[in-house]
Amino acid sequence: MNNKIKTAVAGTLLASASVSNAGITWDAGEWTVDMSGNVSSFAIFSDAKDTTGPKGGLAATQRSNEANSNSTSISTGVLPDWLGFTATTRQNDIDTSVTISFQPDAGGNAALQGGGNSGNWQAFLTFGDKSWGSVKVGKDMGIFASTAGMNDMTLMGVGATGGTEGNGVNFSSSGADTTMGGIGTGYIYADWKGQIAYTTPNMNGFLATVGITQPWNAEGDKVTSAASTGGSDNFAYEGQASYSWTGDFTGKAWVGAFYQDVQNLQGVGIAAGGTDADAQAFEAGITTTVMNIGLTAYAYSGEGAGTTGMLTRGFDATGSARDSEGGYLQATYVTPMYTKLGVAYGVSKLDDNTADAGKNLVKENNRITVGAYQPLTKHLILVAEFSHVESESHLSTQSDSEQDIMSVGAILFF
């Protein structure tokens, strides 16, 4: 792969990974400080084909009071704008670091609101040594599904914009903070979580990370899907193991798992006082590069894990877990002009149960994306994408909702 593409991809991972690597660095006493980040913006053109869709659908729908199915926005893509600082030092034979980052965004579709929101997705410390591994304490990207997300080619672009998920509006016309990319159409969002995690040393390409993470509440409307509120007396548990290899045929294979005891589930079919249930998920993936061709395959399955976001619509209104599964296939090719061309297909499915069979609940969200990513410099990339998103309902009388999305823009890493 050409060095320009390597730098671009490395920059993408840099903005999403745990500890930043060599952006702008300087020494401050015993510490080395690194500042890095990215800025992007895209012109997004959306054509929502339908006025209604299933709950949990990611194909945006027309608003009931709007005759025009088209919408436009200027927004950040999948990655928010990013500014991160990492300070590292080695004392008493221990490598230590602290990372804090900020995420201002370009979204917003109304006056006097400042044009989007700001986030604080990372604030953590690490300590360790290459002989025994490292420990992370604080808020960072979750472990489960993180590698699937970082290998998604739409990370540098827009992908899906989102439908009735999230704020329940057409994201592409609302000026939402970020777009969805392949989240919910191929993998569950890893999210940003408080955690204590241990990562092994690199053992000839083998790495493993296990950790306890902040337990999530289940998300639902309590009519179609149960929801939970309040705290939990147990953590969530996540882990991932991977093996990487180099040479003419480079690549990485990984497996992962998630488990949480979800407490205080409430719904119309649950007795007063709520109930508890287990949520679990498993994943496997592989990504390879041969000359200028990149291939990625990923799959996951869950019980109670839900779809799009972890524990979102994972339980029916009686508190019973729903099964979910999905994955994506992706192929990219770097031309002699350094343009990275890619195509990806992803799908996420959510089963219904006996208690809610045939309701207007999302059965499947799928997406196909074709994209072109052209580096102008080591750090600046022009992006053009087209995505088609479909959402299918368990309700037989509800037609599938469809959306076409075109986007052009630029992203710069430093």
List where the protein language model places each region:
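Outer-membrane beta-barrel channels and translocator barrels
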Residues: 2, 28-30, 90-92, 130-133, ...
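Outer membrane beta-barrel
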Residues: 24-45, 67-218, 233-235, 243-245
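Outer-membrane beta-barrel architecture
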Residues: 84-86, 124-127, 197-199, 240-242, ...
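Outer-membrane beta-barrel "beta-signal"
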Residues: 376, 402-414
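Transmembrane beta-strands of outer-membrane beta-barrel proteins
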Residues: 33-41, 96-100, 135, 206-210, ...
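Transmembrane beta-strands of outer-membrane beta-barrel pores
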Residues: 41-47, 91-93, 102-106, 141-143, ...
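Detector for outer-membrane/organellar transmembrane beta-barrel domains
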Residues: 238-370, 375
